[in-house]
Design a protein with these regions (language model features):
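N-terminal "pre-motor" subdomain/linker immediately upstream of P-loop NTPase catalytic cores
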Residues: 39, 57, 98-192
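Non-catalytic, solvent-exposed interaction/assembly segments
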Residues: 1-133
Length: 192
């Protein structure tokens, strides 16, 4: 295939094929690629074993400055982190509490897309499982094993898959499963 026109024909690019198709021309080592959360893409590659890679939203320098402002403002704040992967998924779906959102809105001046990126990273670092958050969002991960120098995950279809994580904080929460959820009635409200 050539990128130059020959005769009266215009150059064409072949139609994309699924990553696991043996004739795929664009990423032969990619076995699976999915967006697990807005802007968060997971790729499973196969070379010498499986590799589980996470691509998170890209922060501009202005977004990074805004994130640092938010993180320094909330440094020492009592924001409870989820105790399980299920809790992390719920937290990411709900976002910050309204009072925290108002504070962040006052602190951050950026585009709506930049605001979403900053909110994602702030949620991960302040109110979720840090660098483990995107892994918690992928419901295809069945098991996570901590080795001497990395974290290895087992997905429904690919195992073991090495990750870029070495010794992440909150790994015990990531590995925990919610057994049940209980509430207590108080003044007409259900308190978890």
């Amino acid at each position: 295939m050539s990128g130059r026109a020959t005769g009266g024909r215009r150059p064409t690019v072949p139609a994309p094929l699924a990553p696991d198709d043996p004739d795929a021309w664009y990423a032969p080592d990619v076995r699976e690629q999915d967006e697990i959360h807005p802007g968060v893409v997971v790729t499973v590659r196969q070379a010498d074993g499986f590799r589980y890679e996470v691509r998170e939203p890209v922060l501009s320098s202005r977004d990074r400055d805004a994130l640092e402002t938010v993180e320094s403002h909330f440094d020492g704040a009592n924001i409870e982190r989820p105790r399980t992967r299920e809790g992390a998924v719920e937290r990411m779906e709900q976002g910050f509490d309204p009072k925290h959102r108002r504070v962040i809105d006052r602190l951050v001046e950026c585009s709506p897309a930049g605001r979403r990126r900053v909110a994602y990273y702030a949620l991960c670092s302040l109110a979720c499982l840090g660098e483990l958050t995107p892994y918690a969002l992928d419901d295809r991960i069945d098991v996570a094993d901590v080795t001497e120098d990395s974290v290895v995950v087992h997905t429904e279809d690919y195992a073991p898959a090495t990750t870029a994580l070495s010794d992440p904080e909150f790994i015990e929460r990531f590995a925990s499963e919610r057994v049940g959820r209980h509430t207590v009635s108080f003044q007409g409200f259900e308190i978890p």
